[in-house]
Amino acid sequence: MSGHNKWSTIKHKKGAADAKRGKIFTKLIKEITVAAKLGGGDPDGNPRLRTAIDKAKGENMPKDNIERAIKKGTGGMDGVVYEETTYEGYGPGGAAVLVEVMTDNRNRTVSDVRSIFTKCNGNMGEAGCVSWMFDKKGLIVFPKSVDFDKLFEAAIEAGAEDVSDEDEQIEVTTDPSNFMEVRDALEKAGFKPDSAEVTMIPQTMVKLEGKQAENMLKLMDRMEDNDDVQNVYSNFDISEEEMDKMM
């Protein structure tokens, strides 16, 4: 399984997605609001906003919530100014971790993130210490039921970099600059994606087992539980057998 999707698969198996829907909504509303403030309220002319709205719809967020978040962004944010930044560090076993945050209090957030690293047998590093281990890419995911050959042909023609047949899904990878263009072309060709986003894909993986694997999952869980954290990326790999032991 490709590394960038490992955590989402594990969360699904743990049944964590539904339990954390409230937090997911909070993070998505913040992303929609900031995207609308920075790039305007028209998703057709604001790729970041359109991606955020699509994610929200994928999580079954009510339309009213989405519209309120856009209005909040375009009409001012009631004095709240969010700062976007990325923290980097190492998890158990030396796995690289990138933490994207959106915060109105940087001192609070950096303290929280550092504490989570420490409590889960990891350590926070300097800017740039692990970001070079990841590539920023557009990732469009399709169900296995899609005709691979037809999707491959359409994706390459639309400008995609790669199409891979993974264990549980088909993944189309693009350069971030033409991500929306490729996605739109594939949708027009009749291919409906399960998800589409610009993400960070690890170049190599770090295999974890035993206590290191347990602590790594705790670290990911606690990072995502923090209201200021928008996204967490890592290059850890945990085998199916190891996951079964922990479930």
UniProtKB/Swiss-Prot annotation:
<dbReference type="InterPro" id="IPR026564">
    <property type="entry name" value="Transcrip_reg_TACO1-like_dom3"/>
</dbReference>
<dbReference type="InterPro" id="IPR017856">
    <property type="entry name" value="Integrase-like_N"/>
</dbReference>
<dbReference type="GO" id="GO:0006355">
    <property type="term" value="P:regulation of DNA-templated transcription"/>
</dbReference>
<protein>
    <recommendedName>
        <fullName>Probable transcriptional regulatory protein Geob_2326</fullName>
    </recommendedName>
</protein>
<keyword id="KW-0238">DNA-binding</keyword>
<keyword id="KW-0805">Transcription regulation</keyword>
<dbReference type="GO" id="GO:0003677">
    <property type="term" value="F:DNA binding"/>
</dbReference>
<keyword id="KW-0963">Cytoplasm</keyword>
<dbReference type="InterPro" id="IPR048300">
    <property type="entry name" value="TACO1_YebC-like_2nd/3rd_dom"/>
</dbReference>
<dbReference type="InterPro" id="IPR049083">
    <property type="entry name" value="TACO1_YebC_N"/>
</dbReference>
<keyword id="KW-0804">Transcription</keyword>
<dbReference type="InterPro" id="IPR029072">
    <property type="entry name" value="YebC-like"/>
</dbReference>
<dbReference type="GO" id="GO:0005829">
    <property type="term" value="C:cytosol"/>
</dbReference>
<comment type="similarity">
    <text>Belongs to the TACO1 family.</text>
</comment>
<dbReference type="InterPro" id="IPR002876">
    <property type="entry name" value="Transcrip_reg_TACO1-like"/>
</dbReference>
<dbReference type="Pfam" id="PF20772">
    <property type="entry name" value="TACO1_YebC_N"/>
</dbReference>
<dbReference type="Pfam" id="PF01709">
    <property type="entry name" value="Transcrip_reg"/>
</dbReference>
